């Protein structure tokens, strides 16, 4: 079984560089003061998210902590995988919902939490559950919460500067010698471009977690089988498309909403399931 993590890492790095380049461009329009204010706002907001990501996600899913007596298989699998990776044991939670999904959150391995829904526990066999938990632990070990917050901070800066461009275009463009139509165009396209790049970062991290999770468990075909089941299960029992749940959808192992409720692929937080399965099957073939 071969694993090529560097391609996804390079892609993530280049996407973050691209977002930084957008910020430099916007900063050139408004000068240093506006750029500093936007950066301070975005960093402050995302620092809060970084340190509270576990609480926000667990609360949104109404997740409850479980003991080893309540979830013996889940505890045994996670303990074995954590020991294999030489990492601490995370806190385990279960969300009482029929929607088949799982997620991990927490800013580092010592503050990590892993949550499974009752739907996914009922749907998967133990081999598939092990593969899913390996995927989720890989998100923690790869520091994906930190990467997500960096991408979020950069996107927030771009959005804040784009809003400034909009107001400048409407009220101050001609007076300041700037083209108001150009400013309004930038204000419209900037947030869209930032969102597209941010979602691309999220999709890149999903591929990375698929690969590193498959290496951790040594069983890429089990993860492929689990993803196939989860994809079908979501169509039967999706999460309700509520804003609080939508804000946490990027943490899930698969898009938790029914196909008709998804937005375009450029704005999706997850790669197509079929593509993920194909990559895992290629890994298994070596």
From Swiss-Prot:
Binds 1 zinc ion per subunit. It is found in: Cell membrane. It is an enzyme of class 3 (hydrolase). Its EC number is 3.4.24.-. GO terms for biological process: proteolysis. Coiled coil: none annotated. Signal peptide: none annotated. This is Protease HtpX homolog. It comes from Mycobacterium ulcerans (strain Agy99).
């Amino acid at each position: 079984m071969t694993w090529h993590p560097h391609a996804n890492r390079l892609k993530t790095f280049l996407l973050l560089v691209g977002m930084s380049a957008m910020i430099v461009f916007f900063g050139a329009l408004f000068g240093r003061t506006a750029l500093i204010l936007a950066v301070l706002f975005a960093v402050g907001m995302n620092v809060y998210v970084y340190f509270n990501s576990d609480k926000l996600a667990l609360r949104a899913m109404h997740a409850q902590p479980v003991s080893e007596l309540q979830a013996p298989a889940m505890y045994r699998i996670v303990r074995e995988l954590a020991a294999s990776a030489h990492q601490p044991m995370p806190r385990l939670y279960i969300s009482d919902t029929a929607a088949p999904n799982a997620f991990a959150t927490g800013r580092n391995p010592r503050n990590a939490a892993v949550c499974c829904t009752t739907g996914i526990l009922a749907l998967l066999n133990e081999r598939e559950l092990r593969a899913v938990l390996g995927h989720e632990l890989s998100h923690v070990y790869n520091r994906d919460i930190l990467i997500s917050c960096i991408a979020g901070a950069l996107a927030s800066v771009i959005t804040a500067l784009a809003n400034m461009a909009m107001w400048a275009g409407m009220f101050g463009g001609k007076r300041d010698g700037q083209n108001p139509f150009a400013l309004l165009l930038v204000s419209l396209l900037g947030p869209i471009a930032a969102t597209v790049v941010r979602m691309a970062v999220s999709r890149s991290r999903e591929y990375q977690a698929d690969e590193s999770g498959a290496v951790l468990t040594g069983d890429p075909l089990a993860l492929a089988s689990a993803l196939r089941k989860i994809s079908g299960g979501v169509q039967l029992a999706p999460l309700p498309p509520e804003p609080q749940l939508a804000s946490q959808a990027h943490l899930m192992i698969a898009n938790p909403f029914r196909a008709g409720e998804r937005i375009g692929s450029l704005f999706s937080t997850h790669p197509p399931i079929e593509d993920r399965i194909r990559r895992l099957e290629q890994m298994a073939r070596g």
